[in-house]
Amino acid sequence: MQKNKMVDLRAIFWFVVISSCAVAAPTCIQRSDFFKANGPYDINLRAMLSSLPSRVKDNEGFYKTPFKPGPNIAHGLGMCSRGTTTQDCSDCITSVSHTLLHTCPNQAEAIDWSSGDSLCLVRYSNHLINGSLDEDIIWAEYIEYKYNTSFGQTNLTEFKSTWQALMDRVINKVDGSLYANSIQELGSFPFRSIYAIAQCNKDLTKLNCEKCLQHLRIDNRSCCRGIQVGYIARTSCFMRWDLQPFLGLFINGMLPTPPSELDNGHSNTTKKDGKNISTGSIVAIAVVSVVVSTVLLALGYAVSRRRKAYQSFASENGYFSVSRRPRRPYGTASPDDATDDLTASSGSLRFDFRAIKAATSNFHKSNKLGHGGFGAVYKGMFPNGTEVAAKRLSKPSDQGEPEFKNEVLLVARLQHKNLVGLLGFSVEGEEKILVYEFVPNKSLDHFLFDPIKRVQLDWPRRHNIIEGITRGILYLHQDSRLTIIHRDLKASNILLDAEMNPKIADFGLARNFRVNQTEANTGRVVGTFGYMPPEYVANGQFSTKSDVYSFGVLILEIIGGKKNSSFHQIDGSVSNLVTHVWRLRNNGSLLELVDPAIGENYDKDEVIRCIHIGLLCVQENPDDRPSMSTIFRMLTNVSITLPVPQPPGFFFRERSEPNPLAERLLPGPSTSMSFTCSVDDASITSVRPR
């Protein structure tokens, strides 16, 4: 006798909710070169991406463009999950490609995994994409309690151990095609089994594939341990699991649908066309549909109101909002009501405070990298070996909280190789933490102003640092989606990576401009005295030319190896670095500025040209200062004739002479600002126009 076919109401309910609400947002590689719109690379990239869907479809779900030497070559890679139909694969590759181009404009390198049943990977770069184990980026996306299974502690423990055993089996089953799937029974769960697949990029070796999957197995402990449904991926591999079969990969292993809780053996049924359908099920399905629709409408209304309220706040404060990402890497946590707006508006990732606490060994003093007015910076390491720098806001500090919010809202959308990457943040009670990529060589001032370490900065390295900072500021001013003014450029806010390449850090004071906005005013003048231009100190007026002034001072410090504040009094007159260099120019002795640690083996014409550019940047009139795009051309094209600089701002006269600008300033309190991976011994000075 044929059994009545019953409907699992829980599965229907959660399927409707999930399919209506789960939307994945793209991610991009944090550091890459940038290209000009409609330029050679842009044209090649779009041509490559337009052909990628068909090539992936025609090559059994994986295709990598062959290497071609030469400039402006766009290399690409696409892969679809095993079991995806050819049409779904093609559509997925097309969708992800379009999303990446929209999300990462002018970015030469980007990568993203899609989500949903049609799981696929798209990656492109202006460099060779080789078959090495590339693990820089981690995705984790999952749906908690998709099937509404009750998780007691016993069940949760069983699920975790079963999941680990299943992943071990899957990894061991990986064959020459770099793919495997498996099923693991769950004795005490309504759904009885976990279904899982694992897959690697086909350009990996089998050994590297196994290593990549083993890392994912470990990653799961930090992001999604005990989660019933989800996927976790790195750049070269992914794992996916569910309590139901998916993609047609488990047809032979599918178990019977578990009985409905409403089926007690005596339910009323209606017979039609030879099929028995429970009357109670029909009523329940109708009720569930109404409830689901009501819930979704209420959620939509609530989200809409929250978004509008935040956008109003963002507009008033010069911030901007972006879409929320559901992907979460190591130790990240689901946003709660207190931080939901911050997470949704920044697109940044909220880390679990406990994960950061563990990574820094409970903020142990041996991991402390620096301390300032904002708080302390600690080195941390997650279980997978990823090193980070955690900036911890001092609990009683009122000064740091606005800067904290500003960095989360602003820096999360900035991606450039000469900017320090913000990985995420954590807010729990009074604890507020920013999590950055770890930069090993601390800040520029640790080398530049140290009598021993400064010898490591020869002229080619210093010139590379100047050029790298130029690229970073140019991105902020022109190439990012908004015009962003840093407002606190100085040696202690320039970090150096392992190859001594510069990365601009500390965006707590940064402001973004609206479209066509060229300048702004503020009643609260903040920054580091000596790097601030006269129009900002005196009138609170700032623009991109404010950063140009600070950059000019920084150029002169890099060449001279001396702080701007180290010039107190020369020959009876008050002085600073800018005044000192201007006098050297008038005396025809600019090379006297050069740091003796550089030695004699340097290009004198190149050094003089850089000093000249520095003086152009610190001119008193903002309109006379060159833009960062002009500065970049001056640095990289020696055929460009440099204009004659005008006298700089803050040109100090004899002590006996009055200084009109100084008389207009009312100095405020001075506090030290912290930054990623180093101690800033320069001070932040808050001054207000009198």
From Swiss-Prot:
Name of this protein: Cysteine-rich receptor-like protein kinase 21
Give GO cellular component annotations, separated by semicolons: membrane; mitochondrion
Q: Where in the cell is it found?
A: Membrane
Q: Which family does it belong to?
A: Belongs to the protein kinase superfamily. Ser/Thr protein kinase family. CRK subfamily.
CDD domains on file: Gnk2-like (cd23509), STKc_IRAK (cd14066)
Q: Where does ATP bind?
A: L369, G370, H371, G372, G373, F374, G375, A376, V377, K391
The reaction(s) annotated as catalysed by this protein in its Swiss-Prot or TrEMBL entry are: L-seryl-[protein] + ATP = O-phospho-L-seryl-[protein] + ADP + H(+); L-threonyl-[protein] + ATP = O-phospho-L-threonyl-[protein] + ADP + H(+)
According to the record, which residues are glycosylated?
N130, N148, N155, N220, N268, N276
Q: What sequence ranges are listed for the domain Gnk2-homologous?
A: 25-129, 140-246
Organism encoding this protein: Arabidopsis thaliana (Mouse-ear cress)
Q: Supply the SUPFAM superfamilies for this chain.
A: Protein kinase-like (PK-like)
Q: What is its EC number?
A: 2.7.11.-
Q: Which residues form the signal peptide?
A: 1-24
The Phosphoserine modification is found at: S492
Looking at the Swiss-Prot or TrEMBL record, what is one Pfam family this protein matches?
Stress-antifung
Q: Which UniProt keywords apply?
A: ATP-binding, Glycoprotein, Kinase, Membrane, Nucleotide-binding, Phosphoprotein, Receptor, Repeat, Serine/threonine-protein kinase, Signal, Transferase, Transmembrane, Transmembrane helix
What kind of membrane protein is this, topologically?
A: Single-pass membrane protein
